[in-house]
């Protein structure tokens, strides 16, 4: 007998990177990751594959399936395949989206239900245990799974606030990759008192100011160019940041700012692509699309 499950989760952009203080904020973006799980009776383990990235690291998605099976005391073997619109290792929460989609697809395969935050926490645990994240990225995982803007305390694994927002999002995704687990935590911790100030702004709902302050702080600490942020400010954008630990930049923009900022970023000369999307407010459970894995 074969048990099959499909799910989708969304990417996210950074408002406050939690590495410095363990407190973060993020927003969902309308870029999707799909997961397809097939399970059978047996004990030979879980084998994962990432569509379009044959050499990709599959430990996270495999471990997500394993944790769900362990949670319900099931001994099954099988496969998990993921496919994504989110650039890998670009600071756009590809790992959080993959973990969320993998956990949800496995739950659907075995016919079980868990509360949304418990699903998120299983994915965060998997990410920590395989070492793809520094803080567990609970903020990113919440934004990916729940949609909207979220503010979190990652150490306590607590969702402090969530609200929906309507905005276009412009992302510059350089061709080079930067894996979160490789980031310079020591330098990030030096800026903690100032990141705390940005977090206070986010708690007050001043997300764009919080995001921009976060961006300048982390660009300085991690050695990324601030030119992309300054170009956005020149275009009248008020919310722009390095996303995650880079190398992507994300800006919350009005429809009339899209064209100008796109051309400003393209003129900066770094190899990469500009992605136009919007804030996603839908949660992963209610979204039934399967997209690229159909």
From Swiss-Prot:
One of its GO terms (biological process) is amino acid biosynthetic process. It comes from the Archaea. Its EC number is 2.7.1.71. Its main location: cytoplasm. It is an enzyme of class 2 (transferase). InterPro entries: GHMP_kinase_C_dom (IPR013750), GHMP_kinase_C_sf (IPR036554), GHMP_kinase_N_dom (IPR006204), Ribosomal_Su5_D2-typ_SF (IPR020568), Ribsml_uS5_D2-typ_fold_subgr (IPR014721), SK_arc (IPR010189). It is found in: Cytoplasm. Pathway: Metabolic intermediate biosynthesis; chorismate biosynthesis; chorismate from D-erythrose 4-phosphate and phosphoenolpyruvate: step 5/7. One of its GO terms (cellular component) is cytoplasm. Keywords: Amino-acid biosynthesis, Aromatic amino acid biosynthesis, ATP-binding, Cytoplasm, Kinase, Nucleotide-binding, Transferase. It catalyses: shikimate + ATP = 3-phosphoshikimate + ADP + H(+). Belongs to the GHMP kinase family. Archaeal shikimate kinase subfamily. This is Shikimate kinase. It comes from Methanosarcina acetivorans (strain ATCC 35395 / DSM 2834 / JCM 12185 / C2A).
């Amino acid at each position: 007998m074969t048990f099959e499950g499909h799910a989708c989760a969304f990417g996210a952009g950074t408002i406050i990177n939690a590495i410095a203080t363990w407190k973060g904020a993020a927003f969902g973006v309308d870029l999707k990751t799909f997961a397809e799980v097939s399970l059978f009776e047996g004990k030979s383990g879980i084998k994962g594959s990432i569509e379009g990235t044959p050499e990709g690291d599959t430990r996270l998605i495999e471990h997500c399936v394993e944790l769900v099976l362990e949670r319900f005391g099931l001994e099954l073997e099988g496969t998990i395949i993921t496919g994504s619109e989110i650039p890998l290792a670009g600071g756009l929460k590809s790992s959080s989206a993959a973990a969320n989609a993998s956990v949800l697809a496995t739950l659907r395969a075995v016919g079980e239900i868990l509360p949304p935050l418990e699903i998120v926490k299983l994915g965060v645990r998997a990410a920590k245990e395989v070492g793809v994240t520094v803080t567990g990225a609970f903020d990113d995982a919440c934004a990916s799974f729940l949609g909207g803007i979220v503010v979190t305390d990652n150490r306590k694994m607590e969702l402090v606030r969530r609200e929906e927002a309507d905005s276009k999002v412009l992302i510059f995704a350089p061709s080079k990759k930067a894996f979160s687990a490789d980031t310079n935590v020591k330098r990030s911790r030096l800026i903690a008192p100032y990141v705390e100030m940005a977090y206070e702004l986010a708690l007050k709902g001043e997300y764009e100011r919080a995001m921009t302050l976060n961006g300048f702080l982390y660009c300085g600490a991690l050695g990324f160019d601030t030119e992309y942020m300054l170009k956005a400010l020149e275009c009248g954008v008020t919310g722009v940041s390095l996303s995650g630990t880079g190398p992507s930049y994300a800006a919350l923009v009005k429809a009339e700012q899209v064209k100008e900022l796109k051309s400003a970023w393209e003129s900066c000369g770094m190899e990469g692509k500009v992605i136009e999307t919007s804030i996603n407010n839908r949660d992963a459970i209610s979204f039934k699309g399967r997209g690229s894995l159909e």
